[in-house]
Amino acid sequence: MNIVTGKQESVYDLIRSMSKAEKRNFKLYATRLSGNQEAKFISLFDCMDALDEYDETKILQRCPIKKEQLPNMKAHLYKQILVSIRLLDAQRTVPIQLREQIDFARILYDKGLFRQSTKILEKAKEQALFYEQYTQAIEIIEFQKRLGTLSVSRGLVAKSETVSRQVAELCTRIKNINELSNSGSQLYGLYLKLGYTRTQKDIDLIIQVYGQKLAKYEACDEGELSFTERFFLYQANAWYNYILHNLLLCYKYVCRQVDHRQQRPERFG
């Protein structure tokens, strides 16, 4: 019989990563469920939580589970743990809160309660824009457009134009964030692969590919860039100057990034 020990196992790794509060919340969540199947996966959770390393032999000895049942039980446990963590994090994680509000709005929409759906979406959009969750903000606006077509009014055309401009602006924000975060990641990857630039040819190449791109954003006024755009700009500039061995400038941008982050610590959980 092929028994696995010391193997990387997704559900075991997830359990080991859980905080005490998350484990306690899972146990409370699990006890609300009923049935023999649920009792088995709670037993599996307790067994895995007690192990110092993943060991199927010990699991099968200690849990009322047959070997052929184990894969399905682990998959079920994995899903239920994620559900319980999602419920716990819903009150403190903005993207999860927004996802929940969008889902609520969709339920109301499907039931024909358009006014209630619109009210929830408006609050969710305000929250998404405040926390710069632009992808979800666009999803909300597109949903609002669908609701808007159900109420014909004189102001519909003007409102439609405003919404289109807002979506275009958010798409630009997302494009900028992706470009800046990708630049930082690419520069970090180059440093790991090659280290500091050693020749003038390497220096010229880095400046040509990344210098002009970052300078374009540096030229923007303070209010032109969002909090997230500016954060990734500082991060990319730090790696840009580090790989060029401009350590004083690198230090300057690292300090800016730290100061910038401290302005809105709630953005980083």
PLM region descriptions:
Residues 1-113, 149:
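Intrinsically disordered, low-complexity protein-interaction/activation regions
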Residues 18, 102, 108-110, 116, ...:
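Hydrophobic/aromatic side-chain positions at a characteristic register within alpha-helices
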Residues 91-99, 138, 145, 177-181, ...:
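Start-of-helix signal in alpha-solenoid helical-repeat scaffolds, especially tetratricopeptide repeats
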Residues 104-110, 142-151, 183-203, 231-246, ...:
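Tandem amphipathic alpha-helical repeat scaffolds
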Residues 114, 134, 154, 247-248:
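TPR-repeat structural position
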Residues 122-130, 165-172, 208-222, 254-266:
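Amphipathic alpha-helical segments of tetratricopeptide repeats
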Residues 124-153, 261-268:
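Short, charge-rich amphipathic alpha-helical segments embedded
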